[in-house]
């Protein structure tokens, strides 16, 4: 009797839920399959693309809020973006190889770099975002977030080439704009200065111009904040105002070192 009552209570509380949880699992499978298709030299493209199309349409049937004929046509639009996305990702990988002394070859970047994986899934999810498949894109980017510890919103606009090193703890908000040849290290936040629901559809996150390097744990906030071309933002810096081109931003907190006295 108690069990039946509990079940009825749960049903009542769930009565307004329309969530189809399978979309999350399907998106994760799609994401891995898509990455494999683009970067595994042994992938059979014809078969892989067909499998991806089936998965995509299953997901979009849940995620797409438009009439069915429009939803069904989105796959062709998404597929058409993949060569351009792959070209950008190859540029990203080459830029990582060029700038990271610990890297040995492109194969290592493709297989072992969480920063590259985070960039790849960002670029692939961004195209979904542009096609207004917002839930699909969010689930894809959150999967990469879970795998790499890097949170890049699919709505951000990031030029190529782009370099992320170590990846862990990086946050890049929805309205961030990053120009080409930018390097970012672990723990960097490109975020909003304040958050209210009324700020939706406004520029809330920074702009980073080309040839900028942002070192570990720097925090840059605000939609009106621009990091000028060629600047360097030092580790642990806190930036809420624009800085001009070719600036060097440093955290002035000093670290004191003392030698312990021998007893």
Question: Residue spans of the language-model regions?
Answer:
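Short, conserved active-site entrance elements at the starts or edges of catalytic domains
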Residues: 130-160
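Terminal amphipathic alpha-helical/low-complexity segments used for targeting or macromolecular assembly
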Residues: 1-142, 263
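Extended hydrophobic/aromatic segments used for targeting, binding, or gating
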Residues: 197-203
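Left-handed beta-helix
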Residues: 148, 153-154, 159-160, 165-174, ...
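Residue-level signal for pocket-adjacent positions within structured domains
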Residues: 104-106, 145-147, 234
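Non-transmembrane, interaction-prone segments in cytosolic or luminal domains
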Residues: 108-109, 143, 151, 227
């Amino acid at each position: 009797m108690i069990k039946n009552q509990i079940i009825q209570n749960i049903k009542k509380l769930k009565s307004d839920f329309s969530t189809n949880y399978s979309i999350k699992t399907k998106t994760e499978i799609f994401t891995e399959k898509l990455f494999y298709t683009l970067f595994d030299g042994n992938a059979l493209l014809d078969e892989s693309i067909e499998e991806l199309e089936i998965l995509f349409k299953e997901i979009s049937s849940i995620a797409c809020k438009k009439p069915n004929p429009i939803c069904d046509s989105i796959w062709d639009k998404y597929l058409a973006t993949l060569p351009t996305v792959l070209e950008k990702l190859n540029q990203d990988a080459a830029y990582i190889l060029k700038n990271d002394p610990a890297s040995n070859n492109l194969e290592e970047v493709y297989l072992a770099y969480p920063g590259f994986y985070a960039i790849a899934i960002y670029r692939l999810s961004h195209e979904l975002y542009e096609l207004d498949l917002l839930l699909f894109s969010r689930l894809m980017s959150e999967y990469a977030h879970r795998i790499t510890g890097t949170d890049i919103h699919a709505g951000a606009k990031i030029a190529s080439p782009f370099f992320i090193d170590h990846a862990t703890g990086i946050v890049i908000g929805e309205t961030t704009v990053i120009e080409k040849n930018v390097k970012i290290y672990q723990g960097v936040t490109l975020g909003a200065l304040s958050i209210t629901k009324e700020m939706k559809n406004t520029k809330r996150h920074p702009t980073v111009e080309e040839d900028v390097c942002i070192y570990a744990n720097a925090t840059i906030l605000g939609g009106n904040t621009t990091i000028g071309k060629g600047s360097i933002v030092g580790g642990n810096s806190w930036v809420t105002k624009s800085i001009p081109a070719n600036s060097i931003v440093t955290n002035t907190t000093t670290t004191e070192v003392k030698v312990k006295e021998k007893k």
